[in-house]
């Protein structure tokens, strides 16, 4: 053991030295981390651009945590390069902050207290930090990093996952040098404890445990709950909770739990800067738990706020006492909440995470969390607390949140009661080895579902917006490794137990070491924690990382069968449910949304009379059960409790103890179908009160009418009412109420208006047995009486109005009586009830002409009119039971939907299964709806064609056996979803074996790569007419219907564009509203005791404030104008004598009341109006007028005036004086509609004045003589009077000399008295002397004129047309006419130019009342007038009465007449369709080009050409011209020599077709009739033979000779023109024509030859697995003894090879197809069909979902890329003529320099491009890795490139495409490219200062098959 420890201690420093990290001093946290690692490295990441160029040093880590100021915008993409573990990692990253919401904020309370990693209160903006991308261009190698302050994150590579984080200084600060910042990198799967294998398991003592024990020990509680009412079976009446609003139930809605998470000060001190990240990691686990499918609901955990408490004084008081802490936190979180549920910061529940060691009780600190049951959506109680002890705290938070959802523990009584036992999941009371904390038990699912379905989760329905943020998608174990989880749970220094390593439980050592034992809190390791190479923990199991983790959304399974009926009568319920299991949601996928349960009514017939109440039966099931309640007898009997139960608790089973008022809740819910109460028809379903009708049907609205008939129409009964007011002592019979009576209402008004009364109601049966208030005993309290099933409510006698009422049907006759006692005041009994009508046969009848019902079929169907029962008196539709005794007439039927047909249509056919010979094809058959007039077809459900025989979906076919054919890919998606689009597919030419050929081989075959699709019209919005304004005055909103339709068929709104939806609401405004206004109350009419007071109530216009007639205001809301008043009691009047006057009863004071005035008695002029005036007593009853004599009687008649005309006033005339004061006048006329009438027809009080005074300038003084110089004038002339005139003025304006210097003076002309037709102008003319004084001696003959004519042209006048038609024929309409002001010549002018008042342009008409019950009948729309395109459709609109009889249209003219025609569109018209032109008919010269032209109807396809316009038919043929034809001829070669063999029979020569340039061409271009012979017979001499005797030898033993003999051979003499030689081998003697000499027969040679024979082996397997190959076998010449021999006859030698044919080749074109089809999972080289040629392709990643293809390179040394590293000191020269020289004046400091060779390159076989950035099969020999086909340098700016790349694809079957180009990048970049002739080799030299070349991004590095 000690040796092992010593070795371990020695190996760790050695490993650190090897990694070179001793140079770095780590922060203590990182120091502890590296001690647990098997290896790590310290590296410096380099930021590069997408081409690999290094960024300047100040641009490497530019991202900072933002606070204030204007930040630098982050790049969307960035690239980094890391060299570690002998590999080069290229990180291609893109910004990705999707997991953070736009409004994410933190709330910090208190001043931060520095601690371990203390932080500032300023929350950094983290959005710009986060990036996500790939490593080395591998899509499956993901990388997730934060770039703030360095690179922190993880990435995946071939050998596992790597973690990277900046190295912190020992004091915790970061390195300042951003561009040269050291980073720590380590692999996840290599993390080990350095002593993990040095110890064996040891025992763990109990005294070492803190909160947990080994599984063998007894576990203790880890979650404590305030389980109020959890174990209770019943509760008392006082227990109530708030009623929630109802919504649709039994539907799976998405729920959003908005959570406020609070971290206390201890959390801040412990986690420091990592707090936010850590808390979000915990909540991500919680969110994943609540997304598990086992919860049975779609619940989203959403964090809306994170509150960080730095100072304990700023937050709730947190102590060791769990209950107190929970109470304090609940109070505090309510103050942090926003009440508005729609506010972004509102939270539904609050979670406190604390590191305080909370305790459930004294000395019992094993509690990890606390919450109260069922408090979700309660603002003051929806909260929970959880103790943080590592990542396992997430399970505690989820557990406590489950309690908030009202979920009990998995071992609670409620779970056992439901029959669910031994399931321990999230809600397990304790955590042990058998607990599964990720999933939910069936009990938990049941309670969460019930909690939500019963309306307690309504606050979760709003989807949060704004300040919410997503949780991190990273698995928590990938961020916090196992050792870190131990530290979070048990403190620093704790490590994963080395001998208890499994995912199900996290076992940890103590800080002192493993020798102190291991401990656990029964929590599993976090998901994502490494558990082995390529493995990680997932829900307690160690699984491979490649396990499918994509989210899978759940889908509903089928509905199950309906359950049995819950009741045998009275309306039961059947239910069915479905599960979310097709598939079940996995890996965080969404739970199903929609209805999970359906219900239907059953056994709806009413129960027979006398059957026990259903709720009573359920209570009686508990008879004899007392539940250990004190005071209950053993044989207790339970009765239903109806009254006094809260509305929300009506569906719980409350029962009371018989004989007492005590009641208890015995069950959480009553049986389905139980009525919610006695006063309603609603029934309970699954604990909820659901609507039902009196017919006991769920969701029915049927109600009983006043006759007690369910669904009745009040026509089967009549109402009887009466009054009884006579009194005799004792019981007085009021009325007998017969059996069958319903709606019984009995009132007895107290004579004094007080409850104290001596008259009381009573009920008895016909035998005199009292049922209420009998035997002079009266019930004062309210009560209910059940009389043979009819429930009567009695108000009790202690009411001023005593009341008995019942709505039920009375089954037996009752006698209503009134008991009179005491002073025998007359009773005031008022009663009413309904009794059935006995004789109804002649009251009702069947009407067969009801509304049309739905058509029986979508097309070619029938519909019929509904037969309704109507009342004969008014033809009103009544319930059918009223006509039940009458025979029903025959239905009126009519054909419907005749404009369409339903037919099976073959939409498409597959290709024939056999390419040659008999096969079959599948047919795509659908039901289509064909429009007869529109000419279009729409697919419908197949069920609509169910009455027709469906064509078979398979038909025989025959392959064309063509040698070539077009092979197609799948069709693409249609370019448009409606309105006609196109879809395309790819095609290529193949032969019969599926091998790809040149397209020219198939050019004669039709090629279909484009097809029309989705040619049906798009849905569009349709609108109805605007409704009338819904208000009678003021402002309102009128509306219209807006719907989405397709060819007039309604569709869901989602099918139409929401942005173009027309408005459905529009404001409207009518005349101003009138409202009641009240004045102050007057004085009381009494001075003591009771009286009343009055006030004024007026109807006032809201806008003008004028008083209106009372009829303009709503009478129902008229305020009272009278109220009682009570003053001090009156003094008692002492008695005088034995008798006194009877006292006036209090409240008997009378007053005058009056109604509103009637309309005036005349329509115009003076008349009279009247009103009703009456004397009313205190009860508002009519009293004798003598009782009101003390008050003045209001007038009952008044004079009134209704003006017949109106006053019209003209313009004022000019002032009568030219100066000073005068008068002006105008005309005032009484006009009625432009006609002058007598002034008596106008209101004299409103007559305008006709005369008024006018004032002008003061007049000048007049003098009778000239004053002397000594006299002073008595008046100074006004300044306004001119004293002098300028000479030369005309007569009008100048002065005229007169006698002695006097002259006339004139003033300015006044305004013209008229603007037209001879008006007058006036001016002042005065005589003045030289001094300007008034004189009288001016020459009268020369006096200027005082007036003159003015105004030119005639005056305009009013012109008007005839009155138009009245808008209504009755009920008051309006007619109008055109009124204009114009001159006699017809010229129009402004209206004010006409002097007379404007005649009215509108007036009322047809004021008589309209006839009732008429309406417009709208007939069905006729067919469209056009068979295609736009047209018009018409319908019949008739005026009919209530009996459907046709009337003249004038009777309906007051109603808006519906339109009789509208535009229509009958689908698209057929049109010509022209395909593309085919190839020219000749290859040279003049030919013909054709194309297919046909008539097409969209949606149907080809139709007859007669349907299209022949004049517009496109041309189907045209001439074409190719290049001039070449002349071809046959040419021959020389014949082969026949003399080479005496046996040769034929000779050959070469015959070929050549063009004019003697270039060989295809033989089809030459005339086959003139082709020369290529074969002819040889004429050779016969072969010559000779006999040759060989040396002596022994014959074979079996040849018959035993002595040596000379062997004689027969040989053939070969002769040619130059040589004669012998054949080397003998021939058979039978063929030899030469007879040998006798001595030659020494051996029996013929016998020897026959002994040697050919021997053959077995055929080998075919050389190919598919297609045509070769089979081989061994053939050898052997003797009988098996010896090899040369004596076998060659012509008899069997074949050693032959052709073979394997199965048809399935052309595998990608590694993915190879993986799926042949189930290949091993990486390696495989033969794939690449564009018709079989090539060797390397498949990599065959065990992954998407393997990749690589092209093996024959010579890797010829495939390299280089970035040259030397740089000239003088960059503006090119030394050595551009050659490389090591002795150049250069510096070797170019950082991107590198040299990479490639053994394989990745190819995209679909786009035929090489992925140059893939470096998987590359080796970097020096420097940095360089992508394929890339070169560059920083050598020179003088076009002297030194960087080079080489491509050699020889032997691969591919070449570089001619379209491949290289792009120069950088400064002074130059590119030199050399290609081989066959395209297999490319060499390039690139460079600049600094520059490089890469394949052009637009084309990529394209390749082609040779």
UniProtKB/Swiss-Prot annotation:
Residues 721-842 are annotated as: Spacer. It is an enzyme of class 3 (hydrolase). Keywords: Cleavage on pair of basic residues, Disulfide bond, Extracellular matrix, Glycoprotein, Hydrolase, Metal-binding, Metalloprotease, Protease, Repeat, Secreted, Signal, Zinc, Zymogen. Expressed at low level in testis and brain. GO terms for molecular function: endopeptidase activity; metalloendopeptidase activity; zinc ion binding. GO terms for biological process: apoptotic process; extracellular matrix organization; melanocyte differentiation; negative regulation of apoptotic process; positive regulation of melanocyte differentiation; positive regulation of signal transduction; proteolysis; regulation of developmental pigmentation. Zn(2+) binds at residues 399, 403, 409. Residues 201-222, 1265-1295 are annotated as: Disordered. Glycans are attached at residues 92, 221, 714, 798, 805, 1057, 1562, 1719, 1759, 1777. Binds 1 zinc ion per subunit. PROSITE patterns: ADAM_MEPRO, GON, TSP1, ZINC_PROTEASE. Residues 1-26 form the signal peptide. It is linked to Defects in Adamts20 are the cause of the belted (bt) phenotype. It is a pigmental defect which occurs as a result of a defect in melanocyte development. This is A disintegrin and metalloproteinase with thrombospondin motifs 20. It comes from Mus musculus. The lineage of its organism: Eukaryota, Metazoa, Chordata, Craniata, Vertebrata. The gene is Adamts20.
